[in-house]
Amino acid sequence: MASTYSFDIVSDFDRQELVNAVDQARREIKQRYDLKDTQTEIELEEGSLIITTASEMALNSIRDLLLTKAAKRGLSLKIFDFQPPESAGGNRVRQVVRLKKGIDAALAKQIAKQIRDNFKKVQPSIQGDLVRVSGKDKDELQAVIQMLKQQDYPVALQFVNYR
């Protein structure tokens, strides 16, 4: 029996599910009557999506469609950081959507402080873009997870490596 238990708090998403959601959105754009003739392109890059389409109205419809497909695939909508739309030339509109991954240092400090203030028997430690929480009691760690799930953070949190 282990003397201490721990888990990691990370902010990540399943890239394959994102690829599937984008693919489903592309297929529906080709089928939908209002979006069929807009020559819409959705490019998936390493840390972002680029949506290029004919008008601002079509861009709003595509954004809603993409968010719906992502939610159905089990992705958190907090991973999308929509930048302001910009003109792409030739009466076209482009929007860059950055994909949020990892916990930044300020948020990690806030999470660690919140854990320290509420739970005296567990020790949070910041390790790069994750927060490791360790303690002697499994029930305390479960309580930490429940407390963090009730909070609203600007990124989607996952709890991994529970041992």
Curated annotation (Swiss-Prot):
Question: Which superkingdom does the taxonomy of this entry point to?
Answer: Bacteria
Listed A to Z, the keywords are: Nucleotide-binding
Show the stretches that span the lipid bilayer.
none
Q: Quick check: keyword Nucleotide-binding in the entry?
A: yes
Q: Which GO terms describe its molecular function?
A: nucleotide binding
Nucleotide-binding: present as a keyword of the record? yes
Give me the Gene Ontology terms describing cellular component.
Answer: cytosol
The protein's matches in InterPro entries, at most eight in alphabetical order, are given as:
DUF520, UPF0234-like_C, UPF0234_N, YajQ-like_sf
Q: Which HAMAP family match?
A: YajQ
Q: What does this protein do?
A: Nucleotide-binding protein.
| PANTHER family linked to this entry | UPF0234 PROTEIN YAJQ (PTHR30476:SF0)
Similarity comment: Belongs to the YajQ family.
| Entry protein name | Nucleotide-binding protein CYA_0935
Native organism is Synechococcus sp. (strain JA-3-3Ab)
Upper classification of the source organism reads: Bacteria, Bacillati, Cyanobacteriota, Cyanophyceae, Synechococcales
